[in-house]
């Protein structure tokens, strides 16, 4: 599915998604990753069951106002112990399926928000 009709003025754009992949800057990505308007971490937790607290701690250096957690094909919410570092730092967390996270990231990034999308792509 194509996400946007124009390319927003950000460096890293999610331009599409489908079962088992996202399109980042036009390139097909078939593994979990973290993306912000200025940053890409191409290796992250491979799946939901692998999530550890340190995965979320890695996101703190990006200083986002909001983290979108794409949990794969279905919505799941991580245990609060895993995400407490974000809450303690005053960073919002929204969990949703990965396709919804892609759509939400595109909107927020195009508005100039300090958003990070942590996308699980099993």
Task: Describe the function of each predicted region.
Residues 42-44, 75-78, 104:
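Short active-site-adjacent helix-start/loop capping segments
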Residues 51, 73-75, 99:
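Short beta->alpha connector loops
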Residues 90-120:
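C-terminal structural segments of small proteins and small subunits
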Residues 1-53, 62, 110-122:
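Non-catalytic interface/targeting segments
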Residues 52-58, 104-105:
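Short, charged beta->alpha transition segments
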Residues 19, 83, 105:
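Short glycine-/small-residue-rich flexible loop motifs, especially phosphate/cofactor-binding loops
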């Amino acid at each position: 599915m194509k996400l946007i009709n124009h390319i927003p003025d950000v460096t890293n754009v999610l331009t599409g998604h489908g079962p088992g992949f996202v399109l980042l800057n036009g390139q097909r990505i078939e593994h979990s990753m973290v993306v912000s308007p200025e940053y890409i971490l191409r290796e992250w937790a491979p799946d939901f069951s692998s999530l550890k607290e340190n995965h979320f701690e890695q996101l703190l250096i990006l200083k986002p106002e909001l983290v979108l957690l794409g949990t794969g094909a279905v919505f799941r919410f991580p245990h609060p112990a895993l995400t407490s570092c974000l809450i303690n730092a005053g960073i919002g967390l929204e969990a949703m399926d990965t396709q919804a996270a892609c759509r939400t990231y595109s909107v927020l990034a195009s508005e100039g928000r300090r958003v990070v999308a942590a996308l699980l792509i099993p």
